Amino acid sequence: MGLGANDDLRGIVRSLRLRMLLLPLFTIAGSLLFSAAAALLPGNRPLAECLAVGSGFGYYSLSSVLIADVGAASLGEGGAAELATVALLANVVREMFALFCLSLFARWCGRVAPISAAGINSMDVCLPGIVRYSGGSTQLVPLAVLHGIALEVSVPLLIGFFCRF
């Protein structure tokens, strides 16, 4: 069976290590780095807006609503709605790209690469693919779930921070 059918919750919790928090931290750093690089493209948005969009980590439903709400103070209603639409599309594309390329990420970049590429979706939509293409065992499931939860907690904090500029 899988993780949900496992009665040994204590053993699963004991298997979590502090080192596992490095993956979400590196995912956040990499996503923000590439979002900052997007600000350098000709005709693109300011750095803070690109970082706010990148802070969604694939969480399209929450990130677009937060950007529309928090960004209205600094961007105005129209600007915030436009940026929220960009965030929605960027995060949907991230999820679809991760979902369709999980096998390539695992083959070319290692077993944990699909977890990082999936972002928040590592704990739900992409989890079956992560298990399948990262060796077929449920060994990485606790890491994928921890990764998704850590990113989910960081989304409102980072979007709130970057939308203030």
Regions found by a protein language model. Give the residues of each.
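Entry/N-cap segments of selected transmembrane alpha helices
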Residues: 8-39, 84-96, 143-153
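Transmembrane alpha-helix/helix-exit interface in multi-pass inner-membrane proteins
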Residues: 32-53
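Glycine/charged-rich beta-loop-alpha catalytic/anionic-binding loops adjacent to active sites
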Residues: 17, 44-45, 111
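Juxtamembrane boundary at the C-terminal end of a transmembrane helix
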Residues: 156-165
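Alpha-helical membrane segments and immediately flanking helix-loop junctions
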Residues: 48-97, 109-146
